[in-house]
UniProtKB/Swiss-Prot annotation:
Native organism: Bos taurus (Bovine)
Compositionally biased tracts (Basic and acidic residues): 194-203, 672-684
Record's keyword terms, sorted: Acetylation, Phosphoprotein
PANTHER family: GRB2-ASSOCIATED-BINDING PROTEIN, GRB2-ASSOCIATED-BINDING PROTEIN 1
Protein's recorded name: GRB2-associated-binding protein 1
Sites of Phosphoserine modification: S251, S253, S266, S304, S402, S454, S651, S683
Alphabetized GO MF terms: signaling adaptor activity
InterPro entries, per database record: Gab1-4-like (IPR046355), PH-like_dom_sf (IPR011993), PH_domain (IPR001849)
Protein family per UniProt: Belongs to the GAB family.
Gene that encodes it: GAB1
PROSITE patterns linked: PH_DOMAIN
Amino acid sequence: MSGGEVVCSGWLRKSPPEKKLKRYAWKRRWFVLRSGRLTGDPDVLEYYKNDHAKKPIRIIDLNLCQQVDAGLTFNKKEFENSYIFDINTIDRIFYLVADSEEEMNKWVRCICDICGFNPTEEDPVKAPGSSLQAPADIPLAISTAPPSSQVGASAAAAPPPYQLISLPPHLETLGIQEDPQDYLLLINCQSKKPEPTRTHADSAKSTSSETDCNDNVPSHKNPASSQSKHGVNGFFQQHMMYDSPPSRAASLSVDSSLYNLPRSYSHDVLPKVSPSSTEADGELYVFNTPSGTSSVEPQMRHVSISYDIPPTPGNTYQIPRTFPEGTLGQTSKLDTIPDIPPPRPPKPHPAHDRSPVDTCSITRTASDTDSSYCIPTAGLPPSRSNTISTVDLNKLRKDASSQDCYDTPRTFPSDRSSSLEGFHNHFKIKNILTAGSVSSEELDENYVPMNPNSPPRQHSSSFTEPIQEANYVPMTPGTFDFSSFGMQVPPPAHMGFRSSPKTPPRRPVPVADCEPPPVDRNLKPDRKVKPAPLEIKPLPEWEELQAPVRSPITRSFARDSSRFPLSPRPDSVHSTTSSSDSHDSEENYVPMNPNLSSEDSNLFGSNSLDGGNSPMIKPKGDKQVEYLDLDLDSGKSTPPRKQKSSGSGSSVADERVDYVVVDQQKTLALKSTREAWTDGRQSTESETPAKNVK
């Protein structure tokens, strides 16, 4: 053991070097603090493998100690509630973990007493109450500073070894400034008026009804509230009210919930109308009817199930719009209309006075489709009428008093007139109605299904008019197969036939594409699965845990440079160290002396493992390969060239290049001689180990 008086000894956990704080364990070692004031020996801190070991693992010279910090925190699970202090030397920082706070304070007090350290005034992260100014018998007054209660208790428990200097009084504010801001200050917030979110709710409502093939759903609300909306779907963004012919706007009664539609336009007739004042305002026609929004929709949900869903993708079937006389005069197809427009139908009477042929009245809810209506026509037997009977209508109207609006479709370009005209003529000849939606009770009698490839239902003759609204997307025309009309059943409502107008009809999906997904047996309940092996990857140095950091209760002690000048580092700092612990072998090293002469370095590296000279010590420049050129022309003197040896063995000549004449015969002879010598040498070397084997 080293000489000196033993001041303090005990068990401490020592940290590995700074670069190995996480990968290496913190070993428990027996530390001995020795003071050499009486004996003249240096002040050292030794640590041993155990308390009865003879040789220390390492000796820390306290003359090289610069600072001592107590009360550190380390972001590691096993050191959450530990008492850590460090000894900062020139060579390395030693982090030591004590078993209790009293033991940590004892070690710090003894080390600071030997080194002559005082608490540092320029510590920016010092906590309130960590000053250690009060003696042990005088407790700190920590009631005035609530954040410093924990610190004051720990500071009062440790008696100071010497008279400490005063600390700055405003430490509480410094500690608070260092803490990160976990809360958001209201000063940094900026109040802003939220934008109306009603349009988002409407757009969400429209997407929820996409599977109902519903492009235009009547709004069962008051007209004043529905005017503030933008639209239910993506096709008609500008209008929320659904259009109706202006000729009927004046004739309908205000308090009636049943509307009369004009007779069928499939007889090449267009009613004579006059433009109203509301047509210039976006063609919004408001019908003030009793609205029962909250009670109607839940009661009428079952009614929408009995109606047909039009199978044509991306289209809605609406009642054609009437036009002013000036607009109708510009069309070319109207010349072929032979009939005279019928008179305007009378005002609606009580439901029992009307027949199903005279009127078409269907209550519709928000989940209903726009194809749920029928156009009455003259001369059609009541038994084949595609309308719901008057008795059923009365029952429906008694259950729900909702307003009903009808949207008249926009006109089509002239290139679609041929298909629409043929479709109109077919209805005229066959004298059948458009396939409307009926209830489930009359499904066997009045149901006329649509062909999936059928065009949109238009009951007016083909007339051309430029599209007036920019947001209107025309329906996709299709070739109508009259032979199969009414022979196929439309797809169910859950198929969701709604797409863009450019989307082609859906093709039948092959069976191979409908295979179920593979079964994941790991999802089986109570299945015992072998867990995957834990993949442990070594962390790079920059991802490893950092060293223990300073906390609000950290106290730092350093030497006063004016009173205690730092002694120069001795040459043989580690000369007294001996290693008896293989775990700390990385700590034992021989420092390099920068004043070592070249002769000493050669002597130091003369002995190697194989007994020869070390190739690392001997310079490579001693052995050089020189190249000679054959001067075959004896009469011509070639000046010598300087050769430069590169790493690959090739010579790099100077800027001046000399050319010589080579005798081909002599060169070939030299080449053959060299090859023969090389072959003979290789054969000799290959025969030698063969003889040894025998």
